[in-house]
Amino acid sequence: MTLSQLKNCQIITALVTPFHADGSINFKALPELIEHLLNNHTQALLLAGTTAESPTLTHEEELELFSEVQRIVNGRVPLIAGIGTNDTRDSVDFAKEVANFGGFAAGLAIVPYYNKPTQEGLYQHFLAIAEASSLPIIIYNIPGRVVVDLHPDTLLKLAQHPNIIGVKDCTNLDHLAYIIENKPEDFLIYTGEDGQIFHAMNLGADGVISVASHTNGSEIFEMINHITNGRIKEAAQIQRRFLPKVNALFSVSSPAPVKAVLNYLGFNVGPLRLPLVACTRQEADAIINIVLDKAPKEYVTKGVLRPDY
């Protein structure tokens, strides 16, 4: 599907990668999982993001995953490919490859991690990716994971490039409000923080790139629908019930919690690849009870890790 269709999508799911017990990709688990997502208000899919455990996927596995998901989806919703690394040349090559591969509305390029570039280095990095191919680029700013923060003014400078179409923002509401207020009119703003959906949408964001939509898509849809129609109190009531679930889904390094819930629901997404490990039985039971409303409301007090899409 096209970029114009992506612009109408408010709930984008960062798809997990199902694995067999031996660590190989379980492609047979994808159709049922994807149908579940599409039936619960997912309007677009992000492939090979961090929730997909992309750091542990080989390039060949990513391409095979792209082909299989495209076959299953069959044009029903737009697809976004995770194409960013901390090597500009590699990111440029991947953007070109995905553009030639076809079938993607955009590519998601993360702020480079580990090598700690300056703002000028970040600007040049994303400029090179944007100019490498016709693939529209969404920048992914998640300083809690990559250490470096793409400053709002650097992002707004990049937003002037016609092939940089949006940002997935995992910073804070001050940052988000600033870029929404000052962005070009057609520049897309997605929060990458499930817990910020209520505030981000009220500030004027276009949607969310979500982990929680794997398990709580109907709640997210209902909340956004209330906001869109001016029913803020009703949306806030959903947000209050939703926050403990988000806390549970990020109480252990993601995507371990969401995989625990999906496995419980019968979707056979399997284990994680090292260095990530599955939740303990005790952790999984607590997470499942909260996320699926199987126990009295309980807040997770250990703290919330920054979502990793």
From Swiss-Prot:
GO terms for cellular component: cytosol. SUPFAM superfamilies: Aldolase. Pyruvate binds at residues 51, 209. The active site is at residues 140, 168. GO terms for biological process: diaminopimelate biosynthetic process; lysine biosynthetic process via diaminopimelate. It is found in: Cytoplasm. Keywords: Amino-acid biosynthesis, Cytoplasm, Diaminopimelate biosynthesis, Lyase, Lysine biosynthesis, Schiff base. The keyword Lyase applies. It catalyses: L-aspartate 4-semialdehyde + pyruvate = (2S,4S)-4-hydroxy-2,3,4,5-tetrahydrodipicolinate + H2O + H(+). Pathway: Amino-acid biosynthesis; L-lysine biosynthesis via DAP pathway; (S)-tetrahydrodipicolinate from L-aspartate: step 3/4. Homotetramer; dimer of dimers. NCBIfam families: dapA. HAMAP family: DapA. This is 4-hydroxy-tetrahydrodipicolinate synthase.
